[in-house]
Amino acid sequence: MPRSLKKGPFIDLHLLKKVEAAVEKNDRKPVKTWSRRSMILPQMVGLTIAVHNGRQHVPVLVNEDMVGHKLGEFAGTRTYRGHVADKKGKR
């Protein structure tokens, strides 16, 4: 169920301060964050945000299509290594 419109989008305050500082300085360095639950706002477009996936920070270049989504959607947490091959092979 999506968040109520009267509440507005959720974003952690420490991330919002980092984003505003990066926009003000026109800084191109990635903004490092652990906040996967924060929503992508229009002022983040063009920034690179390094989102933590549990092991490392994954750089996410924010574009206009990502606005309204959560940061965690773009940094996968699980690695798929494929199914184990059958030793006997297919008959």
From Swiss-Prot:
Keywords: Ribonucleoprotein, Ribosomal protein, RNA-binding, rRNA-binding. It comes from the Bacteria. SUPFAM superfamilies: Ribosomal protein S19. One of its GO terms (cellular component) is small ribosomal subunit. PROSITE patterns: RIBOSOMAL_S19. InterPro entries: Ribosomal_uS19, Ribosomal_uS19_bac-type, Ribosomal_uS19_CS, Ribosomal_uS19_SF. One of its GO terms (biological process) is translation. GO terms for molecular function: rRNA binding; structural constituent of ribosome. The keyword RNA-binding applies. HAMAP family: Ribosomal_uS19. Belongs to the universal ribosomal protein uS19 family. Protein S19 forms a complex with S13 that binds strongly to the 16S ribosomal RNA. This is Small ribosomal subunit protein uS19. It comes from Ectopseudomonas mendocina (strain ymp). The gene is rpsS.
